[in-house]
Amino acid sequence: MDQDLQEPEGGLTPHLTIRDRRAVDAIDFYRQAFGADEVMRHPAEDGRLMHAHLKINGASLMLHDDFPEHHGARASDPAGVMLHLQVDDADAWWNRAVAMGATVIMELADQFWGDRYGQLEDPFGHRWSIGAPIARN
């Protein structure tokens, strides 16, 4: 694979730890719910996923299974972390994510700041917000 294609895009790349050896399931969910493209994956010898790089909505997202034996951070309940998707059609992105099993935290609705916005939790415990400018007539 071309090394340039594997480079993260954007100035900040979230790197998620997925509990319970479910990183491969998370890739499938992000592909179906958020239209993720898989750039690469690197499995560990024991079958866990050591590293994966996805692209969602033009930005990079990296993830891996939990590796506590390497003294990495144990996946905890996310506190204060929200992954935001700014899109053209919030309803389409929202409906696809909910259909794939995301849990609604804050209903998608028109907000005072001018976006249609809502919050979801994916099946792996990570919180996402989806927003799009409210269409003006």
Describe each region flagged by the PLM.
Residues 21-22:
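Conserved beta-strand-loop-alpha-helix junction that forms the acyl-donor binding cleft
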Residues 1-17, 27-88, 92-121, 130-137:
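Vicinal oxygen chelate
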